[in-house]
From Swiss-Prot:
GO cellular component: cytosol; mitochondrion; nucleus; peroxisome
NCBIfam families: gluta_reduc_1, PRK06116.1
Keyword field contains NAD: no
Binding site for glutathione: S31, R38, Y121, R347, K422
Identification of the protein by name: Glutathione reductase
Binding site for FAD: S31, G32, E51, T58, C59, K67, A137, D331, T339, H469
Disulfide bonds listed in the record: C59-C64
Cofactor (UniProt): FAD
Record-level Gene Ontology MF annotations: flavin adenine dinucleotide binding; glutathione-disulfide reductase (NADPH) activity; NADP binding
Keyword annotations of the record: Cytoplasm, Disulfide bond, FAD, Flavoprotein, Mitochondrion, NADP, Oxidoreductase, Redox-active center
Amino acid sequence: MLRCREVYNICKGAMSNEVKHYDYLVIGGGSGGVASSRRAASYGAKTVLIEGKALGGTCVNVGCVPKKVMWYASDLAHRLLHARDYGLLQEVDISKEKLHFNWKEFAGKRNAYVERLNGIYERNLAKEGVEYVHGWARFNSEGQVEVTRPDQTTEKYTADHILIATGGEPVLPEGIPGAEYGVDSDGFFRLEEQPKKVVISGSGYIATEFAGVFNGLGTETHIVIRKDHVLTKFDPSIQEIVTEHYEKEGVNIHKKESIQRVEKDPNTGKLTVHLSGKIIEDVDQLVWAIGRKSLLGIAPENVGVKLGETGHVVVDEYQNTSTKGIYALGDVVGNMELTPVAIAAGRKLANRLFGPEQMRAQKQDYDNVPSVVFSHPEAGSIGLTEPQAIERYGKENIKIYQTKFTAMYYAMLEDKSPTKYKLICAGPEEKVVGLHIVGDGSAEILQGFGVAIKMGATKADFDSCVAIHPTSAEEIVTLK
C-alpha cells in the first residue's frame, strides 16, 4: 500500500506535466516585476509571478534598502562627533577612535527588516490576486516557461504576455590572480564582522557609497580607482567635491591604479593587494564594486529574444523585445538601473497591455530622471551634465549658475562638510537642463526640484520662487 506522502509525490509529479496558461507571466520578483504584475492584476488580468530568490530583488535584499540603513548608521556616527560642538554630551569623551559599532548586532536588525519587507511584498501580491510561484524559470525549446521548484519538481507555463524582469548581478574581474579572495557588492551584506581594513575596487556609486559607510564606521578604508575622481559618470562638480572630501575625511584613494593580484596569508587570512605601483598589506576584506551585468539564466535564445553586445536584453521604447509578446525592463535591459525607473516602466507596461484604451500608448520617459548617491555628503543629479549640455547645445548656448558654501549646520563645528549647487541652463529662455547638488540633505532636496525640471522650468521660474530661510536649498532659487 502506498503511503499518503508517496501518493502526494506521484500526483505532484503528474501535475507538473500540465501546462498552465495566464494572461500575464512575470519572470522576476524585483521592484519592476512586482509593480507590473500587481498593476496587471488590478485590471483583472490572470497574472503569475515567478521568483527563485527572496522577493524584492536587488533593491530590497542587497541594494538600496540595506545600503541606506548602513548609510544611516555611518551618518549618525558622523553626527555623534558633532555633539560636543553643539553643547551636548560634554562629559563624554567622544572621538572616532572610541566609537564602537556593533556590526554583527546591527546586521541582524538590518536583515530582520529586509525579511519583513519580503513578507510585505508577498502579501501585496496576494492582495492584488497575483499568483506567486517560488522557483527558477527558463524558456524551454518549445517556447514555454519551465519552472524548477526548490524540491526539483518542474512546472510548465505559457502566457499571452511575458515580462522578463530578472534584474542584474555584480561583475567580478577576470584574469586577476587571487580575485576570488574578495567579495562582490552583494557579498558586502553577508559580512559577519566589520573589517578593520578594507580595499574597495571601483569608482561608481556603489563603491563610493561603501567607502563612505566603512570610513564613517571606523574602518581603515582604501578605494582603488582608474582615474582621478570617483563618480565619473556624474557631473565634474560632484566628482571633484566628493573625491576631495573623502580624502579630507581619511579615505585612502589610490588614483590611476588597478589591482594586479591578491595574495592571502594561510595563517592569518589577511590579504595583500598588489596595485600597479604599490602594495596594500594586512587587508581584512576586499570588495569588488566594478559594475553589474544582466541576470539571464533563463535561456532567452530559445524564444529568439535578442541581446545586445553587453548582454542586456534589447528593447524598444515600449519595452518590447525582438519576440512578439515578450517584454523586458529594469536592470536586465541596462538602461537606467534605478528602482523607481523599473517600477514606473513596469506599471506603464501593464497599463498599455491591460489598462483602459486611453493608456494603450503609455511608455516610460527616460529623460530627466533624478538620481542620488548616498555618499558623505550626499550627491544628487538630474538632467544633463555640463559636458553633455555643451555637446547637445554648444558651449555658447548654455549658462552655468553655481555656488559653493558651508551649510549653516557647520557654523558651530570645526569639522566642515562642503555644499555645492550647479544649475545648467540652455537657450535664450534659460531652460533648466541640469541640476547637480552636493551636500547634506541632497537626496530630499532633489525630489522637489526634479518635478520642476521635468515640467520644463526655466531659470526665471526658479527665481520667482520665494526662498525658504534659513536653508541650504534656498541657494538654488537665488543663484546669480
